[in-house]
């Protein structure tokens, strides 16, 4: 299922929300309909937490997480951390990270198996990502951009990358991640696909400006039209899917 939403006139859904297979975070704001889009699809399935991070509403750019964990910057307040711990399932590991590149959502893109990170991220941060999120970590660029989290959107089913990513880069990234990738855009031609949308294994939310063509590409590469609800996602299909996709 791919749906469109706006946060207070902004189409950058990935700036104001974080979505994984086990929880969702949305920014606190006057945009009740933004929250209700998530609520309509997710409320019976995974918890949705409305929060700020370090007093800021751009939570999608400040945090990075997957089914197993959530990483937040070091300037996240104690109250925010406690609120997250109270709202999310006990099994989710929540960890503050002391990292110079503190907009974690811009420098980390991850699914439940593999994370791609900014080439200059600190070694200690890399180890924390591997430990808390339970993933393999690779330093990468996307179309020569170091902000991998801004220019890529990733789930366990597929990925969308910056429209100018070369075929060779797409093939390399795809074999590394073991999921099919497509170069594309969101929000009527925006190349910041990571900031323009959020996705998990059964749902994507993009900006209101996203065209029907962009939406169909998103539904196709993330396999959202195939009735894969949270209960019947089979990650074992991954390898055969990659082979058949090419």
From Swiss-Prot:
It holds the Pfam family eIF-6. Phosphorylation at Ser-174 and Ser-175 promotes nuclear export. This is Eukaryotic translation initiation factor 6. The lineage of its organism: Eukaryota, Fungi, Dikarya, Ascomycota, Pezizomycotina. The keyword tRNA-binding does not apply. One of its GO terms (cellular component) is nucleolus. One of its GO terms (biological process) is cytosolic ribosome assembly. It comes from Verticillium alfalfae (strain VaMs.102 / ATCC MYA-4576 / FGSC 10136) (Verticillium wilt of alfalfa). The modification Phosphoserine is found at residues 174-175. The gene is TIF6.
């Amino acid at each position: 299922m791919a749906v469109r939403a706006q946060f207070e006139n902004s189409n950058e859904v990935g700036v104001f929300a974080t979505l994984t297979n086990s929880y969702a975070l949305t920014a606190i704001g006057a945009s009740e309909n933004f929250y209700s889009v998530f609520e309509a699809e997710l409320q019976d399935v995974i918890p949705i937490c409305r929060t700020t991070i370090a007093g800021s509403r751009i939570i999608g750019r400040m945090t990075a997480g997957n089914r197993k964990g959530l990483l937040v910057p070091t300037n996240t307040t104690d109250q925010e951390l406690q609120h997250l711990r109270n709202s999310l399932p006990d099994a989710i590991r929540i960890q503050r990270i002391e990292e110079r590149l503190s907009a974690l959502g811009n420098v980390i893109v991850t699914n439940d198996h593999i994370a791609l990170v900014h080439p200059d991220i600190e070694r200690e941060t890399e180890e924390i990502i591997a430990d808390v999120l339970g993933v393999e970590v690779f330093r990468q660029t996307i179309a020569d951009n170091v902000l991998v989290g801004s220019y890529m959107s990733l789930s366990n089913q597929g990925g969308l990358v910056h429209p100018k990513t070369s075929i060779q880069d797409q093939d390399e990234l795809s074999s590394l991640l073991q999921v099919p990738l497509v170069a594309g855009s969101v929000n009527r031609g925006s190349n910041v696909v990571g900031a323009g949308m959020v996705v998990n294994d059964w749902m994507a939310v993009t900006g209101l400006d996203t065209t029907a063509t962009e939406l169909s590409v998103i539904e196709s590469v993330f396999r959202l039209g195939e009735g894969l609800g949270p209960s019947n996602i089979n990650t074992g299909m991954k390898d055969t899917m990659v082979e058949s996709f090419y």
